[in-house]
C-alpha cells in the first residue's frame, strides 16, 4: 500500500513538473471553471438559439453528420475535397466549447460524438482524420482544438494518448509543407500532456525544414508579407508556441518580427489585419475575412500565454469587440464573409473587394459561397470566454480578458473558492471581483491594466490600495481573501483620436472603436445567386439580408473634432444599436462622397478636395457615434475636412 501511495505521489509530481517544465508564464485549460454572465451570457445564448443551434440554416456542409461520419460532396465542380472537413471542424470546436460554457447537453453530445467517431475510426497505425484526405493534414489541425477542449473540460488523459499515437504515425517532413505545418499546435499540446519528447523534436524539425508560406525565411527577409490572410494568421502562432515549450529566444524573436511585419503593414483600425483573401494593406476600404478575426485572436492568445504580456490581451479585446461583433447581426442569425471598418452598403452585389468583386461576400447571410467563415464564427466568443481566466506558473489566478463571469478554483491548501467578475465592461470602466470561499485563502490575483488606460485604481473592500506590483501590463494583488471580499478595479476611459492614412481619422473609447451607424433599409434577399451553388438557408426563420443606406452617411470631420459622450442609460443588450449605453455626439460636415457605381462603398477621399454635399456652403450637422460592434452598416474612418 505504501509503495502504491509513493508511486501515485511521484506520478503526480512528475505531471506537475511536466506541465511547468517549459516555464510558460500563463496557461489555459480552465474552461470547466469559467461561467459567463451578463451580456456575455446573453450573447452566447443568442449564439445557441441562432446559427450554432441551427446548422440547417447554414446549409451545406453543416446540415451533415459533421465528423461523426462521411460527408458527401454537394457539387463535383466547386471546392477542394478537404474543405468540408475543415469547415465542420471549425464548427465542431465552436459548438462544443459553447456547450461546455452554457452547460448545454445537446451541444456537448453533438460535438463529442464527432470526436468519439474519429477516435474509433483511426487507422491501424493510429492516424486520425478521414482517409479520403490522404496526406492533407490541415483539417485535423483544426479538429485537434475540439479534442483539446474535451480533454481539458473532462480531464480525459485518453485523448492525449490517442493524439500521441496519431502524431507518431508521421515523419517531420509530412508536416513541413502548406498548412500541414499548423499541426505543430497539436503536436506540442500533446507533448505537454504526455511528456514524450519525440513529439517536441518532431515539431522543431518540421518547423526548421521550412518551405511553407510563413517560414523563418519569409519572416526574416525584408520583403512585406504577401500571402493568404488566414494562412498567415494560423502560421503566425507557430514560433510563439515553439517558444512556449522550449523557451528558446530564437523562436520568440521570429514570433515578434512576424507579428510586427503583419500589423505594421496590414492591421486595420478594428484590430484585425486586412485580407480579402490575401493580405491587402491598411486602406480602410479593404476588408478582412471573418476567419481572420477568429484565427488572429486565437493566435494572440498564444502570444499572451507565452510572454505574460498584457498587450496581447488588449489586442484580443479590441478585435473581438469591434471586428468580431461588427461582422454579425446581433441575433447571431447571419454573418459577413468579408467585413470592413467602412461599409455603407451590404447586399448580394456590393462586395467592393477585388476578389469576388460585385458578389454576395459582404452581405449578412447565414449561407455563403465558400463555407469556412460560416463555421469559424462559432469559435469567436467561446474562445474569448475560455481564455478570460488563466493560471500562472506561480499559482496566480489571472483575469486576462474582461467581461461578466465567474471563475471557480481550489487553493493550494485545498479550499474551494469562486470569484465573480461583476461588470458591464467594456461599457463600464468599473470591474468588481467578489470572493466566495469556504475558508480564508491566500491567493495571488493578477489583474490586467490595458495599455489604453492612463491611470487606474484598485480598492479592497472599499479602501484604496497601492500595494500592488505591476509587471508586463498586469498588477498582482496578493492577500488572504475571506468570503465576501471585494476587489474593485477602475479603468477610466477617454475618447482617443487616431489619424489614419491617407486622409482619415477615427475615434476609440477604451477598447471600443466608435462608428457612425448608417441608417439602414434592411430587406430580405430572396435571390438565389449563381455563385451559391443552390444553397439557401433551410430554416425560414433565418434570412439573407440586403442592407442599403436609408439616409445620408457622407460626413467629414474637422481636424479638431472631438466626440462628447451623451447620457444614455439603458438596461438592454449593450451591442444592440438601440440599447447601447455608449453614445457620442460630434459635429460633422456633409460632403459629396457617393457610392461607387451606386452599389459599392467608396474609398476614403481627401475631403479638402470634395465639394459640400449641397453644392454651396458647407453644412454642419451633429451626428452620433456608437460602438463599432453595435453596427452593421457604418463609417468608422472619416475624411478630414479643413479645420
Where are these regions (language model features)?
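Carbohydrate-binding/catalytic loop surfaces
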Residues: 59-81, 128-143, 179-194, 217-238, ...
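Solvent-exposed beta-strand/loop surfaces of large extracellular or lumenal domains
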Residues: 453-479, 497-502
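Structural helix-adjacent loops and short alpha-helical linkers that scaffold large soluble proteins
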Residues: 24-33, 99-112, 147-161, 191-204, ...
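Well-ordered alpha-helical segments within folded domains of soluble proteins
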Residues: 82-100, 135-151, 176-192, 227-244, ...
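C-terminal beta-rich recognition modules with glycine/proline-rich loops and embedded aromatic residues
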Residues: 255, 314-322, 327-434, 470, ...
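Low-complexity, Ser/Thr/Pro/Gly-enriched N-terminal "stalk/linker" regions
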Residues: 22-87, 105-127, 204
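Catalytic-core region of carbohydrate-active enzymes that cleave or remodel glycosidic bonds
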Residues: 244-265, 284-332, 343-344
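Extended ligand-binding groove/face enriched in aromatic
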Residues: 70-71, 77-81, 89, 98-208
Amino acid at each position: 500500500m505504501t509503495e502504491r501511495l509513493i508511486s501515485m505521489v511521484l506520478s503526480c509530481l512528475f505531471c506537475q513538473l511536466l506541465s511547468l517544465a517549459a516555464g510558460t508564464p500563463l496557461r489555459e485549460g480552465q474552461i470547466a471553471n469559467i461561467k459567463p454572465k451578463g451580456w456575455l451570457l446573453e450573447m452566447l445564448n443568442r449564439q445557441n438559439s441562432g446559427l450554432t443551434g441551427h446548422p440547417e440554416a447554414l446549409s451545406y456542409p453543416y446540415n451533415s453528420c459533421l465528423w461523426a461520419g462521411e460527408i458527401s460532396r454537394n457539387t463535383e465542380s466547386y471546392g477542394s475535397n478537404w474543405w468540408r472537413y475543415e469547415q465542420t471542424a471549425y464548427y465542431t470546436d465552436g459548438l462544443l466549447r459553447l456547450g461546455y460554457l452554457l452547460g448545454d447537453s445537446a451541444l456537448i453530445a453533438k460535438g463529442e460524438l464527432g470526436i468519439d467517431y474519429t477516435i474509433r475510426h483511426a487507422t491501424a497505425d493510429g492516424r486520425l482524420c478521414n482517409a479520403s484526405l490522404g496526406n492533407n493534414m490541415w483539417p485535423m489541425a483544426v479538429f485537434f482544438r475540439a479534442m483539446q477542449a474535451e480533454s481539458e473540460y473532462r480531464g480525459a488523459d485518453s485523448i492525449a494518448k490517442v493524439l500521441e499515437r496519431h502524431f507518431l504515425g508521421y515523419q517531420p517532413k509530412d508536416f513541413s509543407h502548406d498548412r500541414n505545418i499548423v499541426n505543430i499546435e497539436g503536436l506540442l499540446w500533446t507533448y505537454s500532456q504526455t511528456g514524450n519528447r519525440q513529439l517536441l523534436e518532431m515539431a522543431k524539425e518540421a518547423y526548421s525544414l521550412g518551405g511553407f508560406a510563413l517560414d523563418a525565411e519569409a519572416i526574416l527577409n525584408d520583403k512585406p508579407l504577401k500571402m493568404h490572410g488566414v494562412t498567415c494568421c494560423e502560421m503566425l502562432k507557430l514560433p510563439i508556441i515553439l517558444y512556449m515549450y522550449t523557451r528558446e529566444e530564437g523562436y520568440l524573436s521570429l514570433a515578434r518580427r512576424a507579428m510586427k511585419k503583419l500589423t505594421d503593414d496590414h492591421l486595420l483600425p478594428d484590430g484585425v489585419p486586412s485580407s480579402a483573401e490575401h493580405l491587402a494593406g491598411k486602406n480602410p476600404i479593404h476588408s478582412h475575412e471573418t476567419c481572420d478575426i477568429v484565427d488572429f485572436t486565437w493566435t494572440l492568445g498564444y502570444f499572451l500565454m507565452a510572454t505574460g504580456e498584457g498587450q496581447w490581451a488588449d489586442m484580443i479585446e479590441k478585435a473581438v469587440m469591434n471586428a468580431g461583433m461588427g461582422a454579425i447581426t446581433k441575433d447571431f442569425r447571419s454573418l459577413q464573409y468579408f467585413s470592413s471598418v467602412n461599409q455603407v452598403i451590404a447586399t448580394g452585389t456590393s462586395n467592393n473587394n477585388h476578389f469576388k468583386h460585385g458578389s454576395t461576400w459582404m452581405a449578412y447571410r447565414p449561407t455563403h459561397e465558400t463555407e469556412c467563415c460560416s463555421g469559424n464564427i462559432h469559435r469567436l466568443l467561446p474562445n474569448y470566454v475560455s481564455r478570460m481566466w488563466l493560471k500562472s506558473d506561480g499559482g496566480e489566478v489571472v483575469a486576462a480578458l474582461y467581461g461578466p463571469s465567474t471563475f471557480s478554483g481550489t487553493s493550494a491548501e485545498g479550499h474551494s473558492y469562486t470569484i465573480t467578475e461583476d461588470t458591464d465592461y467594456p461599457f463600464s470602466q468599473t470591474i468588481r471581483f467578489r470572493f466566495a470561499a469556504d475558508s480564508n485563502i491566500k491567493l495571488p490575483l493578477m489583474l490586467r491594466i490595458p495599455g489604453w488606460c492612463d491611470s487606474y485604481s484598485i480598492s479592497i473592500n472599499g479602501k484604496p490600495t497601492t500595494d500592488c506590483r505591476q509587471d508586463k501590463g498586469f498588477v498582482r494583488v496578493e492577500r488572504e481573501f475571506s468570503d465576501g471580499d471585494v476587489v474593485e478595479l477602475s479603468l477610466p476611459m477617454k475618447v482617443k483620436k487616431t489619424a489614419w492614412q491617407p486622409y482619415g481619422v477615427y475615434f476609440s473609447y477604451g477598447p471600443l472603436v466608435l462608428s457612425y451607424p448608417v441608417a439602414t433599409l434592411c430587406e430580405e434577399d430572396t435571390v438565389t445567386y449563381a455563385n451559391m451553388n443552390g444553397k439557401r438557408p433551410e430554416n425560414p426563420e433565418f434570412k439573407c439580408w440586403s442592407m442599403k443606406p436609408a439616409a445620408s452617411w457622407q460626413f467629414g470631420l474637422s481636424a479638431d473634432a472631438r466626440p462628447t459622450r451623451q447620457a444614455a442609460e439603458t438596461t438592454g443588450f449593450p451591442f444592440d444599436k438601440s440599447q447601447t449605453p455608449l453614445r457620442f455626439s460630434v459635429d460633422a460636415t456633409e460632403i459629396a462622397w457617393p457610392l461607387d457605381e451606386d452599389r459599392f462603398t467608396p474609398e476614403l477621399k481627401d475631403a479638402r478636395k470634395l465639394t459640400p454635399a449641397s453644392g454651396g456652403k458647407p453644412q454642419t450637422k451633429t451626428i452620433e457615434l456608437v460602438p463599432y460592434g453595435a453596427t452593421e452598416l457604418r463609417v468608422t474612418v472619416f475624411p478630414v475636412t479643413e479645420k
